[in-house]
Amino acid sequence: MLSRSEGQQALEAASEIIGSKGVNRETLAHAYYLRGNAYRQNGNVRMALNSYLESMELDPDGPAAEAYRHIQELLDFYNKDYYNP
């Protein structure tokens, strides 16, 4: 697990790559995936899911698809009563 400062550094580095021009799709998809991981480790699940979705648009078979699925499964389990009153 990353420390808070390491997580912030990871977010900044990934966001810098995402904001750069001329980055290839594979690198961009990986940057979104890494940013999603940093958000998740910082407790910001919503932003993590958004970053994973961005990555999946660029690389549907990349690691973000599995990370997204895992978070969704956890949320479904955690919110089971919300969906099944």
Language-model regions: role of each:
Residues 6, 72-85:
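Alpha-helical linker/edge segments of TPR/alpha-solenoid repeat scaffolds
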